[in-house]
């Protein structure tokens, strides 16, 4: 049985699995590699946007049916850039049980080993559902900040925490909580709380059925938002922090506040959210250029799988589930603006002709072997999960809110594989689809 410090995977875990069985030795290999990562590696290998993806890569490769060799490849592709986890400060870790000390140490990457020890002990004592409830969903000042921090850093705390829950690994849950606690800020928290307040105090009544897709179009149509982030800001973090939330927070908040979720519509709105995220990833292209997947829109899809995992937990209340969907969608809108709010063209998905013609099953087999740091495997698995949960809503009432339907899910997955497999990491993705210079090395079509 897994503990707060020991990895012990069981068969048949995972939301979107390629198979119920893995080759002999796969679970043992995954246990060993994940334990090594947990014991030896920091959660951050650099000070900005340097997230440790080793657990993501190993677990997603396992879920796609990977064997021991595939899992070792998944580990090795991410391990060489990792840095050792520093020694923890015993007094600092002990002090985190005091809310003032917890608050004072939040937002500092150097505090990761202390938060990891703290959450490990908490989970050992009470189990991870109780700890996640207290530190993310209880409504205290600390929990409210932790809830918002799940969406920091391109959703990485949410992705990591949800992987721990999905595969029932308390130690990975502890890693995810520690990551959320110490993550540096892009000002996501004030945006989310400000937008929440705005949604509840606007003079005009909010339509709980406002399609999320219409809000992406509203972002595209807003000249202030289209100009707020620019390539000179540097990386995606700066385009969010200094661009969209620094120069156009009021404009993005007014649009984002219009997305609301009724507790009776959780499944529908969650499916709508992941359909729109997949639409961003597949349709944010450049006319005249070969198809590529925007790195930031990719994360909107992979984080959706993490959200699905949380929505399946009976210990998360319907009200908190509605809030998770609202906040995830609102942050998706921010990242769309930060990538330049490129025109979204459905035909770029529908007209795409895959080079390899892979089915889902053959795609899983191919992705397991691709040298990658986990992004491709996460993306493919999240798309398959999206296809499954969206299918009941793609026809009939409000079907127009679901831009991705039927074979389009597989088409986007094929596009991702075709455009990234065998390429160095900097050439696998587009790092902001709305900025023309980023397409300079992409072949013309």
Swiss-Prot record:
Keyword Oxidoreductase on entry: yes
Any GO MF annotation of the entry: oxidoreductase activity
Swiss-Prot/TrEMBL GO biological process terms: secondary metabolite biosynthetic process
Enzyme class: oxidoreductase
Keyword check for Zinc: no
Tissues where the protein occurs: Specifically expressed in conidia.
Family: Belongs to the questin oxidase family.
Protein name per Swiss-Prot or TrEMBL: Questin oxidase
Organism: Aspergillus fumigatus (strain ATCC MYA-4609 / CBS 101355 / FGSC A1100 / Af293) (Neosartorya fumigata)
Upper lineage: Eukaryota, Fungi, Dikarya, Ascomycota, Pezizomycotina
Name of the encoding gene: tpcI
């Amino acid at each position: 049985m897994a503990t707060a410090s020991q990895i012990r995977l069981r068969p048949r875990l995972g939301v979107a699995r390629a198979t119920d069985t893995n080759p002999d030795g796969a679970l043992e290999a995954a246990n060993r590699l994940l334990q090594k990562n947990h014991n030896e590696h920091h959660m951050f290998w650099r000070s900005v946007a340097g997230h440790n993806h080793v657990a993501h890569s190993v677990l997603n490769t396992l879920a796609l049916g990977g064997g021991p060799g595939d899992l070792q490849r998944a580990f090795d592709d991410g391990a060489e850039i990792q840095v050792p986890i520093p020694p923890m400060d015993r007094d600092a870790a002990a002090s985190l049980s005091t809310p003032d000390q917890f608050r004072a140490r939040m937002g500092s990457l150097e505090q990761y080993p202390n938060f990891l020890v703290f959450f490990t002990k908490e989970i050992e004592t009470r189990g991870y559902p109780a700890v996640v409830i207290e530190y993310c969903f209880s409504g205290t000042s600390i929990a409210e900040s932790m809830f918002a921090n799940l969406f920091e850093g391109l959703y990485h705390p949410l992705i990591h925490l949800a992987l721990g829950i999905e595969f029932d690994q308390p130690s990975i849950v502890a890693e995810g909580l520690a990551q959320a606690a110490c993550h540096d800020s892009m000002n996501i928290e004030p945006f989310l709380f400000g937008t929440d307040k705005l949604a509840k105090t606007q003079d005009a009544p909010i339509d709980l059925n406002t399609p999320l897709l219409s809000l992406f179009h509203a972002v595209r149509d807003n000249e202030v938002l289209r100009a707020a982030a620019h390539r000179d800001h540097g990386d995606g973090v700066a385009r969010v922090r200094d661009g969209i939330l620094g120069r156009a927070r009021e404009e993005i908040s007014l649009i984002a506040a219009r997305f609301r979720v009724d507790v009776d519509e959780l499944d529908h709105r969650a499916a709508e959210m992941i359909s729109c995220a997949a639409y961003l990833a597949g349709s944010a292209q450049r006319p005249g250029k070969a198809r590529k997947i925007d790195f930031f829109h990719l994360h909107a899809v992979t984080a959706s799988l993490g959200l699905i995992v949380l929505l399946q937990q009976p210990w998360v209340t319907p009200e908190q589930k509605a809030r998770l969907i609202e906040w995830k969608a609102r942050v998706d809108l921010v990242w769309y603006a930060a990538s330049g709010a490129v025109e979204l063209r459905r035909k770029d998905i529908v007209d795409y002709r895959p080079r390899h013609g892979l089915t889902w099953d053959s795609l899983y087999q191919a992705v397991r072997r691709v040298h990658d740091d986990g992004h491709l495997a996460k993306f493919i698995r999240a798309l398959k999960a999206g296809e499954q949960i969206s299918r009941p809503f793609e026809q009939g009432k409000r079907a127009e809110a679901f831009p991705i339907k039927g074979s389009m899910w597989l088409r986007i997955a094929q596009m991702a594989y075709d455009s990234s497999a065998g390429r160095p990491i900097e050439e696998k993705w587009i790092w902001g689809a709305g900025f023309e210079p980023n397409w300079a090395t992409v072949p013309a079509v």
